[in-house]
Structures are given as structure tokens and as C-alpha cells.
Amino acid sequence: MEFFISMSETIKYNDDDHKTVFLKTLNEQRLEGEFCDIAIVVEDVKFRAHRCVLAACSTYFKKLFKKLEVDSSSVIEIDFLRSDIFEEVLNYMYTAKISVKKEDVNLMMSSGQILGIRFLDKLCSQKRDVSSPEENTQSKSKYCLKINRPIGEPNDTQDDEVEEIGDHDDSPSDVTVEGTPPSQEDGKSPTTTLRVQEAILKELGSEEVRKVNCYGQEVESMETTESKDLGSQTPQALTFNDGISEVKDEQTPGWTTAAGDMKFEYLLYGHREHIVCQACGKTFSDEARLRKHEKLHTADRPFVCEMCTKGFTTQAHLKEHLKIHTGYKPYSCEVCGKSFIRAPDLKKHERVHSNERPFACHMCDKAFKHKSHLKDHERRHRGEKPFVCGSCTKAFAKASDLKRHENNMHSERKQVTTANSIQSETEQLQAAAMAREAEQQLETIACS
């Protein structure tokens, strides 16, 4: 602790531990859900937080809150980040530290840029400054972040593949970047996606909250043309006027699909071939998401509900499921009063009243209320029929079409059920007839 005495004999004290204690207390309140006035939903996972902390750490949230003027019960859903990435970003806001896997370092920095987090944005800029075109073509080694820990700080990292990044007074000397970027593959420029991101981020820096559509012809042609050299182009040379539109003012109060829909994945994850799940035909932009999804088809469900024995792959999904047993439905429709357990379910329902169709097909003019309907529609454009009947090998583009086909054409159970119902009805009629006959006989005996 330091203190100063001025000429007027006024004593001033500086509490060096205040910042640490302040952050620790705020983080404890967040983890306990105390005084949280905002909930962020990412991939159906809800994160409670304090609005003032989000606005102080992120220029994106600051502009978003000013535009929406949300109240204390607001829930905001963002669909351009992975839930695990946002969880680490949120932990950084409250602890000034980030733990990130090496393969997710680039994604973490891109997410930090979009959210307007100064520390992650600076890391991304330092990483770009260190890399050079000569290194891109001569070296095959990967980027490596070397973080200098403060003396005496324990190492809680259990996985050697996790890098812990700390914001220590924003000192550039604490963070160094070693290694060289990966070599170019198939003639593609490794900076192409980054330049596209920079151009989009420049648009996101405006005062209005914007919605990004990255499936424009200019972007797609640049990413898919292997022989075209974009090294000499600058971010300012890329235009996205046709693909960027402002969020409509008549959007439902208290709700927002922040900064774009599923098309924003084109920017955030880069242009990649879609990976298809062999079990259900659902497509994914990277293998990590596919592996996470494949757990749904396996028996590995360690989180079991004690009330109905239903299993789940994550603890967050189990918590959402438990709301069904309690009957607690905190999300109510302002139009008809219908209540829902989850925020995404309410959002889907509200589109019934507003007729909002935010999911537009980039191949035609059709738009849809739900993302799943858009995916089914896009499969028809591509001619994909991933859902195959196990009895006759007939293929379908939608899972519902396959189920309908199996019920109509191969449902032996349905035929047995129908036969049983007919037999049961016949037995009931026979029993009723026998009862009437017995009553008539009793009446005859009584009269005689």
C-alpha cells in the first residue's frame, strides 16, 4: 500500500490489491448468479453475467446494449461463436486470464476482434505483425504462443495442449509469438480469410449493430478460386455492400440474433468443405463440431436425470432438461402469453406472430423461419439425400420424409396395432351382446 501527503496535508492511499479483490468478487457473484442482470445464450448454453462488465470489456456489447435498451430480464442469443470459446472469453472478462487450446488460438483471437476486446485484438495484431510472406512459404511449423507467468502464480493447467493467456497490465513484453505460420496449401493464400475478416470487422465497427451475410458472390469467388493471388489486395479493396444489412428496428424487443446468422460462420471459420454426419446427415464446418455432435448418437451420456433416467452428453443440457420436471417456464410470449422453458424455443415461437424469416437461401429468393428448414431446403438444391431407408434403401432429403415413408410402407408395428384394435373392438361388441342376452333371459324368468 502506498500513501502520499500533499502540501495541504491531505493524505491519499492507493490499495494495490483492490483490482484483484474486485475482479474476484465479481467473478464469484457471476458464478453464484448474484446480481446478474443479463443472460447470453450461445449454442443453447446460457451464461449469466453483469451487463456493466460486458459493456466495459467489449465494445460490441456496449454498442448492442445502447441500441437495444434491454431491461434487467433480457436474454440475448448470439449465434456466431462457439459456446466453449465464449465461456473462455467471459472468464477473461472476470479474471484477466484465458485458457485456450492451441488449435483454437486463431478462433479465439477472431472472436475477440469481433467482440471488441482490446487485449485479444492486440494479440491478433501482434501475431499478424510477426508473420511475413517469406516465412509463409519457407516454414511448415505452427504458431506457438509463449506466455510468461507472473512469479508465484500456480499452474492449474492439466492439459499440455492448453495455452493460458493473461492480461497483465497490457504489457507487450508479457506475450511473445514464436514460430512461423503454416505453409500454403494448394496455392491458397493463408491470409485470404483474415483479410475478409478485417473488411467485415471494419463494417462491424460502425455505430449501428449490423448483420453480416458472407455468401456474396465476391467473397465466395475469392475463397474458391485457388489460382487467384490476393496477397496484394488490402482489406479496403474488398466490398460487401450487397451482403450487409442493418438489423430491422421492428425486431422483437428484448431479443437479438447478434451480428449475423449461420452465414457468419463463413467469416469466422473460413471457407471449408462441409463434413457430414454419417448417422443423420447433418453437416458441419469443422471436425470438432462433428465430433461433439456424434456424441448424440452414442451411448456415452454420463449426465443422467435422477427423475426419468434420461442421459445427456453435457451438464448444461441436463440442467435445461431438469426445468421440464419443475414446470418452470421463465420465457413468456408477450403476444399470446404462452410460456417456454428455453429462450430459443420462445424465439422460434415469436416468429409465428411476426412472420419473420431471417434464414434466407443464398441460391434462391426463399426465406425460412427456422434454420433447420433452411438446411432441408439447401439439401434439395444440392441434390443431397442423406436419410436412407433401412428396408428398401430409398433416400430422402429430410428426416421427416424418411420417418413418414417408414410408417407408411414398412411399419409392421402399425399393422399389428391396427389388427389388435379391430380385434379388441370385436370382442367388446360380442361381450355387450352376451350381456344383453343374459338380461333378456333374466327378465323372462322373472315374468314367468
From Swiss-Prot:
User: Which domain of life does the UniProt lineage start with?
Assistant: Eukaryota
Q: Where is this region: Disordered?
A: 130-193, 404-425
| Residues of the BTB domain | 36-102
Q: Name one GO biological process term.
A: negative regulation of DNA-templated transcription
Pfam families hit by this protein: BTB (PF00651), zf-C2H2 (PF00096)
> Keyword Zinc-finger, does the record have it?
yes
Q: Which InterPro entries match?
A: BTB/POZ_dom, SKP1/BTB/POZ_sf, Znf_C2H2_sf, Znf_C2H2_type, ZnFinger_BTB_dom_contain
Give the Gene Ontology MF terms in alphabetical order.
DNA-binding transcription factor activity; DNA-binding transcription repressor activity, RNA polymerase II-specific; RNA polymerase II cis-regulatory region sequence-specific DNA binding; sequence-specific DNA binding; transcription cis-regulatory region binding; zinc ion binding
Acidic residues: bias regions:
156-167
CDD domains according to UniProt: BTB_POZ_ZBTB14
Q: Where are the zinc fingers (C2H2-type)?
A: 275-302, 303-330, 331-358, 359-386, 387-415
Where does the motif Nuclear localization signal lie? 50-66
Q: Where are the transmembrane segments?
A: none
Q: Name one GO cellular component term.
A: nucleus
Composition bias, Basic and acidic residues = 404-415
Q: Where is the composition biased (Polar residues)?
A: 416-425
Per UniProt, subcellular location reads as: Nucleus
Q: Is Repressor included in the keywords of this UniProt record?
A: yes
Residue pairs linked by disulfide bridges in the UniProt entry: none
- Subunit-level organization: Interacts with ZBTB21.
What family, per the record? Belongs to the krueppel C2H2-type zinc-finger protein family.
Entry function = Transcriptional activator of the dopamine transporter (DAT), binding it's promoter at the consensus sequence 5'-CCTGCACAGTTCACGGA-3'. Binds to 5'-d(GCC)(n)-3' trinucleotide repeats in promoter regions and acts as a repressor of the FMR1 gene. Transcriptional repressor of MYC and thymidine kinase promoters.
Per the record, the domain comment is:
The BTB/POZ domain seems to direct the protein to discrete regions in the nucleus.
Name listed for the protein in its UniProt record? Zinc finger and BTB domain-containing protein 14
Q: Tell me which species this is from.
A: Gallus gallus
